[in-house]
Amino acid sequence: MSEFWLCFNCCIAEQPQPKRRRRIDRSMIGEPTNFVHTAHVGSGDLFTGMNSVNSIQNQMQSKGGYGGEAMSVNVQMQLVDTKAG
């Protein structure tokens, strides 16, 4: 018994090439609009405990522009010491 292969080109669609993301350079980025600086928050500020997180949230809400309703968020953090001792 012999094999017979028949190819139907009409049924096979060419796969579209994935679009490459356009590279952004500094000239494409404009100045911020309606920017209001309210606080400095560093990575170490969040690891000092929940009192610090609440303090930051209260400070930012007191500056305005964060909506009328306060948003309640549960924050769980795990601190992992990566220093070789």
UniProtKB/Swiss-Prot annotation:
Q: Which CDD domains match?
A: CRIB
Record's Pfam families?
A: PBD
Instruction: Look up and give the membrane topology term.
Output: Lipid-anchor
The Swiss-Prot or TrEMBL record describes its family as follows:
Belongs to the CDC42SE/SPEC family.
> What PROSITE patterns does the entry give?
CRIB
Which UniProt key words apply to this protein? Cell membrane, Cell shape, Cytoplasm, Cytoskeleton, Lipoprotein, Membrane, Palmitate
**Does the entry feature the keyword Membrane, yes or no?**
yes
Biological role stated in the UniProt entry: Probably involved in the organization of the actin cytoskeleton by acting downstream of CDC42, inducing actin filament assembly.
Per UniProt, subcellular location reads as:
Cytoplasm, Cytoskeleton; Cell membrane
Q: In which organism is this protein found?
A: Danio rerio
- Its domain of life reads Eukaryota
InterPro entries in UniProt = CRIB_dom, CRIB_dom_sf, SPEC
- Protein name in UniProt: CDC42 small effector protein 2
Gene Ontology molecular-function annotations: small GTPase binding
Record flagged with keyword Cytoplasm: yes
Assigned GO CC terms = cytoplasm; cytoskeleton; plasma membrane
UniProt-listed GO biological process terms: regulation of cell shape; regulation of Rho protein signal transduction; regulation of signal transduction
Q: Matching PANTHER family, A to Z?
A: CDC42 SMALL EFFECTOR PROTEIN 2, CDC42 SMALL EFFECTOR PROTEIN HOMOLOG
- Per UniProt, residues of the CRIB domain are 29-42
